[in-house]
Amino acid sequence: PVRSIFRKRRDVNVFMEQVQEIDVKNKRVLLSGRSPVDYDYLIIGLGMVNAYFGNNHWAKHSIGLKSLEEARKIRRKVLHAYERAEASDDPQERRRLMTSVVIGGGPTGVEMAGAISELTRRVFKNDFRSINPEESRVVLVEAADRILGTYSVESSNSALKNLEKLGVEVALNSPVKDVRAGEVELGDQTVKAESIIWTAGVEANPVLKTLPAEFDRQGRICVEADTSLPGYPEVFVIGDIANLTDIKGQKVPGVSPAAIQMGKHAAKIIKKELKANQSAPIESRNPFKYLDKGTMATIGRSKAVAEVAGMKFSGFIAWVLWLAVHLIFLVGFRNRAAVLLQWAYAYIGYRPGARVFDLPTSEVDILENERLQRAES
């Protein structure tokens, strides 16, 4: 809802374009579908993209979760797999279609595995006649010895127990050897699955490589204490693409609360300098200080883990905290009210989420050709 947020600000323009290059020397941003945009100040928050540790061919056989379109692909993939399983007479093919593999045991992977298991085992429970959704298989793959590695051991163990209660198979100490069409090869087994979801690795947006900057191993930009690009004080880099140790000596994590705080910090600097009608030396700018408001991950219905101000929560209380935080960060009262009502309906009726999906054009063409062939015969 970016346009609606700024609908009363006639001095704000919104462009839905792809950034091709950032020319900091000429203070210009090159876009894919329109003329370049010149700037006086620039805030870069392009975010991360999926990384496959040098195995880029894995991207063809798995779906990441870094964009809305990828989220839609996951929904389409899972729902269509069960429709195909319902129509199949082959038990092994049914088993494969009803198996989902989530690679990566971080917060995103844990939440995804729990959501798919609840959807397929409980929501689908009475929807099909030829298959039994309770026989669904969800495998969460993690190379380390525990999931939620950045959380405490207590929270990690709690999340593991809750996932197992939901029927999720958690494969620890299981680095991925290969991802092929319809299967994932681990150290000691090969899992055949229709839905393969990648949440294991990220790297900085490749557009950043056009910048004259120092990068870390993940491609993040090493920034100044005020989040500006070294040598270019009018350019700020925020969010998970910034490699920054704050004034307190703590590494700023690549999470949304940190990105929001960094954005506000950069905006205050810009506002102050515009008001003074001059740029200030970096040394006189206030350094960024990260306020850790805690971490949390939802696992399923009434199940979550949270660590806030040194306190650890799990179960229903942590789940309510997770809901509250996500409501707070929504824009506008109407959006908050609508989401709250949707959540309440889903919780009471156990009918979460929209289950309408469309097929990719290629699959639609295949089905149409099959229909025409049957008609001709």
What are these regions (language model features)?
Residues 1-41, 149-169:
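N-terminal Rossmann-like dinucleotide/flavin-binding domain of flavoprotein oxidoreductases
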Residues 32, 45-46, 174, 199-200, ...:
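Short, well-ordered coil/turn residues at beta-beta hairpins
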Residues 267-377:
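C-terminal, flexible cofactor-proximal segment of oxidoreductases
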Residues 12-101, 186, 197:
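FAD-binding core/adjacent interface of flavoenzyme oxidoreductases
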Residues 61-90, 182-185, 190-262, 268:
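FAD-site-proximal beta/loop scaffold in flavoenzymes
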Residues 96-100, 112-174:
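Rossmann-like dinucleotide-binding cores of NAD(P)H-dependent redox enzymes
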Residues 103-106:
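Glycine-rich Rossmann-fold phosphate-binding loop(s) that bind the pyrophosphate
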Residues 15-17, 172-174, 180, 239:
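Short loop/edge segments at beta-strand edges and connector loops
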